[in-house]
């Protein structure tokens, strides 16, 4: 398997993760997001198919997006002179694993790859990884160290974060 950064001339290999929204993003929107400089998408391919994909964009964590207890915990993890009104993050905008490859820890491998990339090759400075997790995926992200930004979450997704500083 190889990780490839999506380009405008990329030819997609077969992919279906079972979530039509994710399939549509990869096959129809990912190149548009890249062209508009909104997100960078990476595909993981083997000889015959797209095994998985994920897209990354810039983000931030601020008091407005979190409850006070979470914000206090985040802010207190930094020395007082480093307290800010928000902190830089990288957002996993989309992550999908081909249905044929699910339950093989590929999603966890992707999260580990993103975490290590931003620890070892952090070009712009970010200290968190964020995701708006589908409710059905919250336990997956929790098992990979992500925490909810708010105690009360309404809607289809749950904003979550991972603190990269715990890896250094």
Predicted regions, residues:
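Short amphipathic alpha-helix that is part of the acyltransferase structural core
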Residues: 1-32, 36, 41
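Conserved beta-hairpin
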Residues: 37-55, 68-70
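Short hydrophobic/aromatic beta-strand element in the GNAT-like acyltransferase core
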Residues: 39-43, 53, 89, 94, ...
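Conserved acyl-donor/pantetheine-binding loop and adjacent beta-alpha core of acyl/acetyltransferases
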Residues: 55-94
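A short, internal acetyl-CoA/4′-phosphopantetheine-binding micro-motif in the GNAT/acyltransferase core
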Residues: 93-103
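Conserved acetyl-CoA-binding loop-helix of GNAT-fold acetyltransferases
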Residues: 103-117
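Conserved GNAT acetyl-CoA-binding A-motif
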Residues: 111, 118-133
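Conserved catalytic-core motifs of GNAT/GCN5-like acyltransferases
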Residues: 130, 142-162
